[in-house]
UniProtKB/Swiss-Prot annotation:
Compositionally skewed regions (Low complexity) per UniProt: 124-147
Keywords: Cell cycle, Cell division, Septation
HAMAP family (alphabetical): MinC
Taxonomic source organism: Ralstonia pickettii (strain 12J)
InterPro entries linked to this entry: CAP/MinC_C, MinC, MinC_C_sf, MinC_N, Septum_form_inhib_MinC_C
Bias type Basic and acidic residues, positions: 110-122
Lineage: Bacteria, Pseudomonadati, Pseudomonadota, Betaproteobacteria, Burkholderiales
Record carries keyword Plastid: no
Region (Disordered): 103-147
Purpose of the protein: Cell division inhibitor that blocks the formation of polar Z ring septums. Rapidly oscillates between the poles of the cell to destabilize FtsZ filaments that have formed before they mature into polar Z rings. Prevents FtsZ polymerization.
Assembly information from the UniProt record: Interacts with MinD and FtsZ.
Record-given protein name: Probable septum site-determining protein MinC
Length: 264
């Protein structure tokens, strides 16, 4: 009897985490200049992340030169993998050679499309490149929750070493980091993130759309903070109320809220 050969490959359904870039103009010169201004000096920002281009916010008569946008993103170390478009946009959008993709982020709630777009779709994965304004809370919150084993939910990941530039950690539950998260390092979790040291890199919590996820740290100095795809970068200085201090970050009405923590 001949032995059955093991298959050399398999094809199955799956999902891939990706950033979602939503241009609001088809003026490629202006768009390229703005992307370069924001990210050229921080090449580790994208760090070879895959990115989908969402053209649904463009006006009906606008045609974005997607090939030029792909070139700009490649120069910034982002890898474009496809285009998200409305049925009316599909014809011209796919003419640039990228596949059409489905997006499973939350849709605007109705009303004026432009106003709803400004409120931001909450995208999946590591979030769309749109800045959410940080709301300052007037009152301090209680001390950072304990990270002892009894308090942890199943699937919590603990990292007890410093994370250097270029290192990335992904947790399918909560993530606890007991040492420094350096500039250029990235911590990602489907649940909450706790950093018991300086947070200087990127922290992305609730990356599968968990709007209740939070980020806690004992020294807030990040390059980027994101919850459920809504994020803010350190390009604008962090307010003194929580900069380089213990803080937590949460979502309220699709807006990032930063609150100082009382450490006792």
């Amino acid at each position: 009897m001949s032995q059955k050969k093991a298959p050399l490959f398999e094809i199955r359904s799956g999902t891939v985490d990706a950033l979602l870039l939503s241009p609001r103009t088809a003026d490629m010169d202006a768009l390229a200049a703005e992307l370069t201004r924001r990210f050229a000096d921080t090449p580790e920002f994208f760090s070879n992340d895959v990115i989908a281009i969402d053209v649904r916010r463009l006006a009906e008569d606008e045609r974005l030169p997607i090939d030029r946008l792909v070139e700009t993103l490649t120069a910034l170390r982002a890898r474009a993998i496809g285009v998200v478009a409305s049925p009316e946009q599909a014809g011209w959008a796919q003419a640039f050679g990228l596949p059409l993709l489905d997006s499973h982020g939350r849709r605007p709630r109705g009303g004026n499309d432009a106003k709803d777009a400004d409120r931001n779709d909450a995208q999946d994965a590591q979030g769309a490149p749109e800045h959410a304004q940080a709301a300052e809370a007037p009152a301090s919150t209680s001390a950072i929750p304990p990270a002892d084993a009894a308090a942890m939910q199943p699937g919590t990941m603990i990292v007890d070493r410093p994370l250097r530039s270029g290192q990335r950690i992904y947790a399918r539950g909560d993530l606890v980091v007991l040492d420094l998260v350096s500039d250029g390092a990235e911590v990602i979790a489907e649940g909450n993130i706790y950093v018991y040291a300086s947070l200087r890199g990127r922290a992305l919590a609730g990356v599968k759309g968990n709007l209740d996820a939070r980020i806690f740290c004992t020294c807030l100095e990040p390059q980027l903070i994101s919850i459920a795809g809504i994020y803010r970068t350190g390009e604008t200085p962090w307010p003194d109320a929580y900069a380089s201090k213990p803080a937590q970050v949460r979502l309220a009405d699709n807006t990032l809220v930063f609150e100082p923590l009382r450490m006792k």
